[in-house]
Every structure is written in C-alpha cells, then in structure tokens.
Amino acid sequence: MKPLTVYTPEQVSSSMPPDLSFAAYRFLAEGDSWFTLSTLNPAHNSNLLFEMQFEQFACAVNCAYPGDTLARMCEMNSDPVFVQLLRGRRAHIWDGLLLSCGGNDLVDALKAVGNGVPRAQRLLLARDEWGDAAHGPARYLSPEGWQTFNTYLQANFAHLLGLRDAGPSAGCPAFMHGYACPTPRNAGAGFGLGPWLLPSLQAHDIPRADWLALAALLMHELGDLLEAIAADGVRFPNLHFFDTRAIEIMPATLDDEGESGDWVNEIHLTANGYAKLAVPWAAAIEGVLQGA
C-alpha cells in the first residue's frame, strides 16, 4: 500500500511546483480540523489525510485549515484558494474531491443556547423544554433546530458541487467521511484551543450522566444527515459518504484531560485512531474510482 502524498496550495503554486503526474489519483481536499492539526504538540499531531493508503500512487492538495467549517469551503471570499484550484485560473483536473464536512459545523451549532433563541436556531433544548427521561438523550434535541441544520448542510453541499461542476473537474466524485464518537471532556489542543463539545453541554445543563449517550446521539444524527444527502443522487450527484459509525474506536476516559484511548484530545484522534478510519475510507474511494 502507498501512503497519500499531501501538498499545500503554496507548494502547487510555487515557482517549482511538484509534478502531480506520478499519481494515478489526484485529489483536491478541503474541510475541517480532521484534515489539519489535531494538536499543537508536533510529536502527537496527525490527521485523516496523513493516514490514508492506496493501492496505486495518490496525492492530494490540501486546502483545509484548523477551524474550517463547511460554509467557508463554498465562500469565495473566505477560501479563494480552494475555489481557484477547483474552478479558477489555477484549476486542475481532479480525479476526486476529499471533504471533511459537518463536524465543526455541529460544534458551532451546539453553541446556541437559551429560551431567547428560537428553537429552530438551536440543536439542543433549554432545561425547561426537555422531554420525558424515558426518551433518553433524544429528549435534549430540538427537532426544529435539526431541520434547520439539515437545510444548512444541504445548501452548502449544493453550493460546493455547483463550484465543482463549473470547472474542469465537473462531475468528478466527491468523497466525505463520517466521524467517530468523542467523549465530552476537558481536553483541548493547547494554548486555549478547546475543549469544543463540553462547554456546550455544560451551558445547556446536560447532566454529566448523559454526556456520553448524548455525544453518541449527536454523531449518529450527523451521520444520518450526511448519509441522506449523499443518497440523493439527483440533487447531489456523485457525492459519496463513508459511514464510520460501525468502526471500533477506543473511547477516551471522561475525566482524562490528555491523550486517552484513540483520542489525542476531546474531538481529534491519535494517528492510530485516524488510521482505523482512513485505511478503509481510502479503500472505498479506490473502489469507486476503479469502477468509474
């Protein structure tokens, strides 16, 4: 197996750009922090792209940066480099797009809190809105807010695929992945970055006993939304979702504030954790490309 060779946009645009013709598969990558830095400690840093392996040589130009959300991938003013490489004067013909989408969007959307915020703009309910305890962690979810979130994701994927289809790589396959289930805990990336999930659960007064179950439900709901979007081939042609929910990832311990299980911090995996997802995802991608 051959590891994915990852380049930055700056390398590709330099006076001596790398020759991409060696690769059987040439990807343009964009997304959130699962494609960039998982921690500020270089000895423990990895990402999903670094752990991908293919049967044939493959390379990717990675436009992602920490904190990216799906909207930024589609807004020219926020990420002109990605758009230029996809459909602008610097565009290449790509064999596929690699996308890490939805995770940071979910984290951002969970921050909305309080009865003063309409339910359609909140993913979680206020304490006095909670349903019956018999419903488990689902009693904390705002159905109206999740519908808004789904509409938001769909609009952004439609925009992104529109950018794809306006350039020389029109119709090329776009590949997105699911996420693993994090443990809400006080484990950031250093220098004040994170935790990301825990503060929102605390702000919503979610009982500690339900943190793990709610985190699992949030990831399951996000996976369902992404899977449904990819399944709608009419609105979102040649978009492929790799479901990671059945892959066994060693969970972190709730009270551990450092590396724990397959997690380097609250929402980012160790190199070993990423490899558990990246290797089968790469195999699925290669299967699509070989069948094209």
Language model regions located:
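Histidine-centered active-site loop/cap adjacent to the catalytic His
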Residues: 260-292
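Serine-esterase "nucleophile elbow" of acetyl-processing enzymes
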Residues: 1-68
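Hydrophobic, aromatic-enriched interface-forming segments
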Residues: 147-198
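Substrate-gating cap/lid alpha-helix
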Residues: 185-242, 274
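Short amphipathic alpha-helices and their capping/turn segments at secondary-structure boundaries
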Residues: 13-19, 76-97, 156-171, 228-231
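Well-ordered, non-membrane alpha-helical segments in soluble/globular domains
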Residues: 42-47, 75-85, 143-162, 211-228
